[in-house]
């Protein structure tokens, strides 16, 4: 018999599948892109300033490096558990069909995207505590995009958050990380003073991200 955890995974997956083809599904496809420079902009609306390599170089580099750290933190567990992803069980579409070959070869548990999103949310909340509520919410719904995309189970996403938090805790032992935090804080202050807002439609993004599987944690 399925455990309560399995039942939750299946229930959330059913709710997520109902969002296929919606604006939230399209947002999940955009959230899947971790390549830079696109990845640097995933949290720009939540932060409230534009992020780019030219005008916020320390912040840009901090996000890029921490992406690598958080991704690395999940790889051993993915290899160990080799959990089948939802689309392999339910035979339904994913929001990024071009990634299918890679997804089939990579274990579902834990979610690397969720780990990265949570890492970014925690780091950015330290740099800009006045935006912490929006940033933490973005970290959560960034992971939930993997549910909507039909490539992760709820338990994968939760485990990803744990791995993200562990990644940030380890980074705090690195003096270079602390220096980068301070430099990034100054860049954000300068960007706010200059009125450099995110390029995207943040009102529309925020509205779309309010849509989530009802039972998601």
Question: Where in this protein do the model-derived segments appear?
Answer:
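Short alpha-helical linear motifs
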Residues: 82-90, 157-165, 185-188
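Interfacial helix-loop-helix junctions of multi-pass membrane proteins
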Residues: 141-172
């Amino acid at each position: 018999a399925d455990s309560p955890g399995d039942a939750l995974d299946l229930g959330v997956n059913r709710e997520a599948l109902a969002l296929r083809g919606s604006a939230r599904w399209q947002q999940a496809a955009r959230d899947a892109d971790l390549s830079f420079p696109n990845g640097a902009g995933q949290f720009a609306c939540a932060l409230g300033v534009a992020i780019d390599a030219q005008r916020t170089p320390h912040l840009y580099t901090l996000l890029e490096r921490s992406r690598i750290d958080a991704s690395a933190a999940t790889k051993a567990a993915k290899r160990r558990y080799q959990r089948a992803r939802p689309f392999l069980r339910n035979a339904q579409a994913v929001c990024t069909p071009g990634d299918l070959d890679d997804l089939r070869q990579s274990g579902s548990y834990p979610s690397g995207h969720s780990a990265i999103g949570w890492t970014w949310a925690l780091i950015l909340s330290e740099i800009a505590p006045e935006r912490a509520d929006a940033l933490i919410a973005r970290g959560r719904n960034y992971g939930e995009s993997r549910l909507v995309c039909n490539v992760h189970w709820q338990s994968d996403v939760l485990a990803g958050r744990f791995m993200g938090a562990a990644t940030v805790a380890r980074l705090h032992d690195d003096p270079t990380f602390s220096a980068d935090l301070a430099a990034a804080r100054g860049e954000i202050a300068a960007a706010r003073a200059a009125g450099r807002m995110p390029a995207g439609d943040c009102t529309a993004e925020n509205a779309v991200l309010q849509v989530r599987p009802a039972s998601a944690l």
